[in-house]
Amino acid sequence: MEKLDGLSLDLEKQNIYKLKELFPIAVEEGKINFDLLRAMLGDEVDDSKEKYQFTWKGKTKSIKLAQTPSAATLRPCKDKSKDWDSTDNLYIEGDNLEVLKQLQKTYYGKIKIIYIDPPYNTGEDFIYNDSFSDSLKNYKELTSQASSSNPESSGRFHTEWLNMIYPRLILAKSLLTSDGIIFISINDCEVENLKKLGNEVFGEKNFVGQWNWLKSKTPPNLSKKIKKNIEYVLCWQRGGNTNSFRGIQKTSKSDDPITKPQNSIKRLCFKPNTLKFKIEKGIYNKGIYGTEKFPNKLLNDLEIENFTNKNEVYFENRFIWTQEKLDSEIANGTDVKVSRQLVISYKKANYMPEVPPNLIDESVNVDTTENAGRDLKNILKGNLFDYPKPVSLIQYLLNFDIGKNDIVLDFFSGSATTAHAVMKLNVEDGGNRKFIMVQLPELCNEKKEAYKAGYKNICEIGEERIRLAGEQIKHQWQDEHPGEEFDTDIGFKVFELDSTNIIPWDNTAQYNESNLFDLSEVFKEDRTKEDILYEIMLKYGIFDKKVEQIDVNGKTMFRIGRRYMVVCLEDNVNSEDVKAIGELGPRVVVFKEDGFINDNAKINATYNLEKCGVEDIKCI
């Protein structure tokens, strides 16, 4: 019986595998021959010594950091969660670098939209200082301190920020769907570096654009030269996205002309009851009408009855539409109106959403940070978070190109505005989008209102915001739809990043004579069966599947998916137990290595389960 691998997805091996698939001739004894690879790529290889490149101290280590597999895990926290058994939303407490590695096996190529609002590197908001040797240990140290700064006087001001964001973007890219999109909020301190970095990670041709968001109408006087009231949102696509982005839905308060002076003359036929007139009844003889500047030629007599044309009528003019377009517009509910002078105009019932402009402000129904602060204060009953992003901003960005069942990820989730926006969007259009929030549990400053209100760290603020915002959305919907059932998912499962539950997988453990007996144990003493279960699901890449606790021959086991996996972490497992597991028809079965009643039961388990059609049998 094989043992389960305890590491996260190895991106380096994944990349090598892809190269071997594309260029098998360049593989010799299992390794890449780069001379052969260069020869096959021909002129596309740049061997010149002088070339344009974006580099900084620590860049190579940052790449290695992203590619180094992790043996950490995510432990379930049911007491912090809401609607655990029914929700598909996730809130993960932990360093996002480690968490992104843990998400790879399950969510590789599955996330449609990523939005992040990373630290802006203002000198005082910087807590992420990754350790190349042990990022999990480094995370534990980070969460025991209230803040960390990156002063400009350090001499590595931009370098530290680049080394922080680079490996995270590398990992984020692999999570995006083939038509996925990433939005990144930033200010002018790092916007230039971010654009260069994003172009390197996602490809310059996949840079969609830069939006300017009106952050504030009353910016502070921090400079003698300029008031800064703009922040930026940069966007890249994964590569396979050919969709037009959807901006706001245009509503026309006035009628639009159906003619243009520069257009060629066309003849259009208006079928009976397709024109709207201001007069109830009348007759127009064929002839020239309209105005002197914009004449309109009526080609046959027109009879009006009940404010519309009783007969088929023909006009000749410099129309903007063809006959086919006219018929289509009328079929879709467009009103074609005619004045007393027979000047023709139209008003659409529905306009296609406009491509979003590069300015984001109240003209597209997006609030400022002042509005966002007031809204958050109303939800949390206090000023608990500095400079939150407005829900309307995130919702506006998500609406550019999102389906009703897509997954949204925010791995710098802060006050959880993105989760709020996803829930609000779902209730508005009946969608079933899921969110994944990731946040470092950075300690609250003891002098701030959040700490005085009882919040120890930022995660507690974000989780409470999701709870209260979800209830607010639910109550508002119920007020507007009395008697109807509310079915939008406003719950979330909380997980926390931690070291592995499996002692043999923990390469950070220190052993001496006093604790050497622990080596005979498989699971850490303070870990539960559910901790171990979700670690198994992480390693198998099925972290998003539903879990059912079942009874098998009086033993408690777990079934993941309808017939995908059975996990047995019980002791004294015998042949009858194995037979009962096989009858459930799973594809995968995982046991505790020392859980069998004897060696024969363990040896026979593989044989008997394979006879039942089980494809994969592992132990831990």
Short names for language-model regions:
Residues M1-Y115, Y120-P167, F591-N598, C612-E615:
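DnaQ-like (DEDDh/DEDDy) 3′-5′ exonuclease domain used for proofreading
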Residues N96-V99, L103-T106, M164-L169, L175, ...:
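Phosphate/ATP-binding catalytic cores across multiple sugar-kinase/actin-like superfamilies
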Residues Y108-I181, C189, I230, G247-L299, ...:
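SAM-dependent methyltransferase catalytic-core segment centered on the flexible catalytic loop
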Residues Q145-E160, G209-N221, Y396-N405, K424-I503:
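Cysteine-dependent PTP/DSP-like catalytic domain, specifically the C-terminal lobe
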Residues I165, S178-D179, D188-G247, T251:
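Signature of N6-adenine DNA methyltransferases within the class I
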Residues S216-P220, I226-N229, G239-K377:
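Active-site-adjacent helix-turn-beta-strand microarchitecture at beta-sheet edges
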Residues N405-G414:
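Conserved class I S-adenosyl-L-methionine
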Residues K539-F558:
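Conserved helicase/translocase motor-coupling segment
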